[in-house]
Amino acid sequence: MRTEIRIAGFGGQGIVLAGAILGEAAIIAGMEAVQTQSYGPESRGGAARSEIVISDAVVDYPRVACPDVLVVLSSAAMRKYGTDLGENTKVVVDDDMVQMEVEGAERIPFAMTADALGRRIVANIVMLGYITNKFDLVPRKSMEESIFKRIPKGTEELNKNAFQAGWDLADGKKPKIPKKDKKESKDEKKKDKVGSKDKKGKTKKKSKDKKESKDKKNKGGDK
């Protein structure tokens, strides 16, 4: 069976990375996969598209002719890459980033969920969690392995939470958003307090210096 997936958005949203992760996840799972990409000359903000063909047999044609699944993360990308759809194409759009009306599309808050997690850059991982669960494209274990092979070190927990949030959205659940570290917040407040005291201290010293200068002037006048 051959499945064609197109992921589209703009530069800076991790569109190409998401496609590469999905393609590699399919290979990890023992399937055949081909991933192609295209993007504008701008490093950020220009149109970007990643296409993935997954099959249980050798992929003889690497291009997406008519996507089975279309995921779009911006209005401009919807206008550019959402034209050659079939009757059975499943369309998913970002509820916040795609503001135009898209008939029959599922509207999912990928970007807003990523914002709640603290970093909008992981909206692509939220999206991967969603489509992995919703469309059963590849096994969850394979997808997670592929994600952790490609993300920067030190971001494992954030990406793990992003993937789970997307998975929960596909189940119709409200994603669990980890609470921010209270200690960090207290330390910041403490710093602000200390900074405020220092400022007051400097003001008092300045006033004292001014008084001493005035006293010296008066003494000079007596002579």
Regions found by a protein language model. Give the residues of each.
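Active-site cofactor/cluster-binding pocket
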Residues: 1-193, 197-205, 211-223
